Amino acid sequence: MDSSKRHLLLILDGWGLADDPSVSAVEQADTPFVDHLYDEYPHGVLKASGLEVGLPDGQMGNSEVGHTNLGAGRVVYQEILRISKAIEDGSFFENDALVRAARHAKASDQKLHLMGCFSDGGVHSHLEHLYGLLELARREGLAPAQVNVHAFTDGRDTDPHGGVDYVEQFQKKADEIGVGRLASIVGRYYAMDRDERWARTERAYRLLTDGTGAAFDDPVTALKASYDDGVTDEFVEPRRIRADDADAFGDHGTRIEDGDAVVYYNFRSDRARQLTRAFTEADFDGFERERPDDLLFVTMSPYDDEFDLPVAFEKLNLEGTLGEVLSARGGRQLRAAETEKYAHVTYFFSGGREAPFDGEDRVLVPSPKVDTYDQQPEMSAPELADRVSRSLREADYTLAVLNFANPDMVGHTGDFEAAVAACEAVDRGARQVVEAARDQGYSVSIIADHGNADRLQNPDGSPHTAHTTALVPHIILKDGFEGPVRDGKLGDVAPTILTLLGEDVPDAMDGEVLVPAERAAAS
């Protein structure tokens, strides 16, 4: 490859373009550098949600989906659609791993446990998939009390007080199907940590295996009591639900114990790994625990290449991603993020590949150890900007990929002022890195992977903590290039970058090139 061709892809995670500036931290923040880029350089907008990124129509985008599409250079149809389609066409009920779990419980007169994020947010899971599992259990002949559901309440990708509605919806659906009952509730803050805060994971594990948590007679009361204490869905402390028939199957009918079967129905991997490790790894050292014997543990999708577990929906093998193409052509690349988004610029951007490509360097900066990021809205952006700027000066990379996590991670807290501060921190970091890149002869693309900080308030005035379906920016800086930049989707970014680098676009990338090829090559 031509060593003089260099490109920086800067991802402002959660930096959506607002419909209503009054509720947008992006619009209210003082961001002189990004504002300057809009004034001076060619730009367009990108679709980052729904069908354009392989999600159901109208479904908000997320970081996993966004980075997968960005790296693939095409629309990548996501697990949520694959699973939903399997339920619709009936193949779900013949899925080897799922049927095996149900039959394991039935054959040994043990329990089937279904656990996962309890919402229709569509980012980590979907309740329709849980209902599909209940139907499968019914078809396999499991008794009503033999199927326990452990709800990891959301409140991050959904309304913070939406849990009660989901519980009532579930109870109605379970009654219709004829199997399944809610056995425990805990917020995703505990059950779905991904930053090795093992004390959180341990509290969820103790609830599931020992029943350690406040006891309630019904799940609606359990959640309302949490709300009364000012604790919303994401942060609900462990709660077990009493059952009259608790000893009908096994010694403790709602707990996960020896001989049971578990289906973890989250389809997104990053926040499912820690709890899976606690249940399945013989040499686990995150905390002291007793591991149930003869436990069949099934995951909805592959959570980690190192897990030797039954998987219901294997990952699609994505070939010809941007990283793979550049590596095969002799290019060097850099992937950089803080902990919260490290998997996204590596595993997801590489199409589900854990290992670096030849010539790929990685920069990981630890995220701050705070309970929620509104307490430190700058997160680790200053250190990350320093590290990447230094790397760009010290090595020649064909492609550098950098993610600033702040607008997304702070946006999830619903704290408007903190989200404004997060956007301002990213503006400062972006200035530092972009100026360093331009000094070294890099062209630059500045984008976002989905919306979030563009809407921090609901119409009723309550905090909005979820992602949005907003369009996202696409700004290009390249000497001699004056545009235009056509509007497109995330899957168009990789072929556009290859064109800016003067490289051929592989057949596997069917995304569109959003710049005139002759002008990009000539600049």
UniProtKB/Swiss-Prot annotation:
Cofactor annotation: Mn(2+)
Superkingdom of this protein's organism: Bacteria
Protein name, per record: 2,3-bisphosphoglycerate-independent phosphoglycerate mutase
A GO cellular component annotation in the UniProt record: cytosol
Organism for this UniProt entry: Salinibacter ruber (strain DSM 13855 / M31)
A single BP term in Gene Ontology: glucose catabolic process
Entry note: cofactor: Binds 2 manganese ions per subunit.
Pathway the protein takes part in: Carbohydrate degradation; glycolysis; pyruvate from D-glyceraldehyde 3-phosphate: step 3/5
Active site: 63
Keywords: Glycolysis, Isomerase, Manganese, Metal-binding
InterPro entries from the UniProt entry: Alkaline_phosphatase_core_sf, BPG-indep_PGM_N, Metalloenzyme, PGAM_B_sf, Pgm_bpd_ind
SUPFAM superfamilies named among the record's database cross-references: 2,3-Bisphosphoglycerate-independent phosphoglycerate mutase, substrate-binding domain, Alkaline phosphatase-like
Family that this chain belongs to: Belongs to the BPG-independent phosphoglycerate mutase family.
Reactions it catalyzes: (2R)-2-phosphoglycerate = (2R)-3-phosphoglycerate
GO molecular function terms attached to this record: manganese ion binding; phosphoglycerate mutase activity
Subunit structure of this chain's protein: Monomer.
Role this protein plays: Catalyzes the interconversion of 2-phosphoglycerate and 3-phosphoglycerate.
Its EC number(s): 5.4.2.12
Binding site for substrate: 124, 156-157, 188, 194, 268-271, 341
Binding-site list for Mn(2+) 2: 13, 63, 449-450
Binding residue positions for Mn(2+) 1: 408, 412, 467
